[in-house]
Amino acid sequence: MKSCEHELLKTRRGKSREVSSRFLSSPSASSSPNRRNSTSNSSRDDQNNNGVKGHLGLKKHDRMSDGTRVCFGLPNQSSIEVDTKENRMPSPWINDEDNVILPGRFSVDECALYRASSRRNSCSLLYESFNDETDSELSDVSCASSLSTNRSSWNHKPGIKVSSKYLHDLTAKPSKGNNKTKLRSQDDSQRTNSSKGIENRLQRNNSVSRYGSSMSQWALSPGRSLDTQAVTVPSSKLKPPRGKGVGKLINLGFDFFRSKNKSSPFTSPLKPKTCDTESAHQLKLMNNRLLQWRFVNARACDVNKNVASQEKNQLLCAWDTLIKLNNLVLQERIKLQKKNLEMKLNYVFLSQVKHLEAWEDMEIQHLSSLSIIRDSLHSVLSRLPLKEGAKVNLESAVSIIKNAEAVTDAIISTVDDYAPTMEGIVPLASQLAEVVVQEKLMLEKCHDLLRMISELEMQERSLKCCFLIQHKQTFDTNLLKH
């Protein structure tokens, strides 16, 4: 690789000398067709790559806060526009993309002076290679490592620092036609000479990127490591041609700022270092991954919520079905109990059917026996028994019965007459019965008292006898003493 680069440098330097020799000649119309062809090719490539840039999410003309441009996605490829207007004045020291002159130091890329049209071709090739990367996942690591090594080699090539006063001196002299024509011819020749070497190198990078097209899905995933850096186009090591007059002065300024760039830690107070651009690019990648992970987490949360709601619905449906099954089981149990009771009742009825069938045969005999009992009771109550051949005179019996009926009628009439008086006598009789009961109780008490009185009389008599005996004894003793 190093030998190929040295050969390319040698060939390009030789061609740059030829351009410097042509720079001294009068302006010709041969440079303008080349320029037009390059712009037309670049416009076609730009149209073809619009879809690729939209797919890769590249941001065009994104500027930092200090006024410099930072490329996201593909360094040295963020802007592919070329000025196609012929009336605009080209400048070999200021790129068409960076058409803003910054105060103080101005960072100019070494490759920007030589390739304007060839960059568009290289960008189209790289975009195609990155589009092919989205088809596979296995070779992304190898591609990222090779491209990171290339980029590390390219990052060691800082741009040429030009002071603002030289740029003012150059832009302050637009009236000199010779300088304009020389600069245009020099720019066109340098672009045409440097296109071949860059295309060869881009073909090698394209082969590497096509080999790494099987890991694009893994590479584009949020979990990809930060080591995979963006692909950049290698800048050539060519130097701008050394012209006469103002060119020598500019070359002296280039050498001065180049030596100062090697000694100073910062290339420019306005334009950040390559590490700053890399850190900004990594920050964008990390932000992109963070957004992707947030989207993934939000989608996962949404999916979890949907799954939870579905599970809840399923649980509710299962709970409802279980309740229905419990109700069905209870209903079946109730039906089973009813059937068991019906079977028991049928068994009892079947056990009594034989007796009922036997009762149908016994019912006639039972009715006949009941009729006989009724007749016998009637004869006992309403008929006189005649035994041992007794005979009755019917006339006398009838007269006696009539007299008995008349007596019973008289008794009934007297009872009816005394019935209201008996209604008043009944409570008196009840009261009299109560008085009689109380009288019996009092009589019993009197009997007890009389018995006690008799006992007390006996005791009184015995006491009197004892008292008399004692009195007599005392009297006798007194007499004996006297």
Swiss-Prot record:
A motif (QWRF motif) lies at residues 292-295. InterPro entries: QWRF. Residues 21-42 have a biased composition (Low complexity). Residues 191-219 have a biased composition (Polar residues). Residues 1-60, 171-220 are annotated as: Disordered. Transmembrane segments: none annotated. Residues 1-20 have a biased composition (Basic and acidic residues). It comes from the Eukaryota. Belongs to the QWRF family. This is QWRF motif-containing protein 3.
